[in-house]
Amino acid sequence: MNRLMILVFAAVILALASADDVDIAKRGVPCLCVSDGPRPRGNNLSGTIWMKTGGYGGNGCPKGWHFCGKSRGLLSDCCKQ
């Protein structure tokens, strides 16, 4: 069970977008922004999950991005460019 949790966590970390990537809008783990409204079928997720790191400040979003989620996560935030 512990190995499975480590593998899942590693997969999430590797799937997250990097702020230096050229195709940043096409990569990362999607999340629900407030502007997306309620989530009926067919509604798109327009945000991207960013892990909170020291370089991004308190909101967890990189430069040029803003927080768009309903609530802040412990280790990550939903951000939109």
Curated annotation (Swiss-Prot):
One of its GO terms (cellular component) is nematocyst. Residues 1-19 form the signal peptide. InterPro entries: Myo_ane_neurotoxin_sf. Its main location: secreted. Disulfide bonds join C31-C78, C33-C68, C61-C79. Residues 20-25 form a propeptide. It is found in: Secreted; Nematocyst. GO terms for molecular function: sodium channel regulator activity; toxin activity. Keywords: Cleavage on pair of basic residues, Disulfide bond, Ion channel impairing toxin, Nematocyst, Neurotoxin, Secreted, Signal, Toxin, Voltage-gated sodium channel impairing toxin. SUPFAM superfamilies: Defensin-like. Binds specifically to voltage-gated sodium channels (Nav), thereby delaying their inactivation during signal transduction. Causes death to crabs. Belongs to the sea anemone sodium channel inhibitory toxin family. Type I subfamily. This is Delta-actitoxin-Aeq2d. The lineage of its organism: Eukaryota, Metazoa, Cnidaria, Anthozoa, Hexacorallia.
